[in-house]
Amino acid sequence: MMRDIHTKKIKKNAFRVTKARGFTASRVRVPGGHLPVKHMATIQKIAEEYGNGTVHLTARQGFEIPGIRYEDMDVVNTLLQPVIEGLDINQPEKGKGYSAAGTRNITACVGNRVCPFACYDTTTFAKRIEKEIFPHDLHFKVALTGCPNDCAKVRMHDFGIIGMTIPQFDASRCVNCGACTRVCKKKSIAALEQVNCRPKRNEEKCIGCGECVLNCPTAAWTRSKEKYYRLTLMGRTGKRNPRLGEDFVKWIDAKSIIKIIVNTYDYVDRYIDRGAPGGKEHIGYIVDRTGFEEFKKWALKDVSLSKNAEVAKTVYWSGIHYE
């Protein structure tokens, strides 16, 4: 039977056009990749009763439920409502599913609720960003990782957020065992050295990983109360020029990161190639075309950076060129 399917409309509603004729797949957003287990029952119900009985865990930490008939999209949207509300996802009209799919699900490592290496709660920050930028049709990818280990591979995204800390030293607790300097040399970048029987931190070299904090047996090193981040830019995969994101701002605060991302939507709306296939153009290619300085002007508009923030004077990307 022939069906009149508006492909752009169903894609915007977070359904995929699949290779199976007459069938689609529902894409479920999970900001920060953390899902209360009660919602698993809803996903299972949709998969078993309206899909093909399987669920795909996506690279962006969401769920994709394949094998859904086009005529069942409305009922699937209705069933997804408790999940959407439970995850506090912005939704202009209840019961209609997701209102956009351009801005991708924000991914994150498990963060400091579980991992001792993480410098902050990645899921909470991911949800905070989600509230500011979704729904939107522009193609943005944001990822968060708790520390410089970068388990979430954030340098492959448009915006990568890496947790940092400024280690605080209490000399009265130090027994000069040398554990911090040894671990910094072996596991990090040797930003500590022993001077007059005390560790001395090279502020220019330190990447804020917190290895010294984790390995000090007397808790002479502690994490800073303030949360800091490294913001990376315009990493990407793809056919033309895959590349890793480069540093934009070091020791930046959360509020400034959100403002920069929001500002970038205005920048993209101004410079995107309207004639690009599907009306989509990767942000990185727009920056390549306009130049970094123009992007920087838009990104930092009305941003009040903290005194510790270090903004890159310029950024150069390389990667692999297939053209």
Segment roles from a protein language model:
Residues F15-K19, F159-G163, Y229-G238:
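Short beta-strand elements
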Residues K227, G235-G275:
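A hydrophobic, small-residue-rich beta->alpha segment in the mid-to-C-terminal subdomain
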Residues D4-H34, R104-G111, G245-D247:
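Short glycine-/aliphatic-rich beta-strand segments at the starts of folded cytosolic domains
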Residues A179-R201, E211-Y228:
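Iron-sulfur cluster-binding cysteine motifs and their immediate structural context
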Residues S26-V175, A179, V183, E204-I207, ...:
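Small-residue-enriched alpha-helical segments and adjacent helix-cap loops
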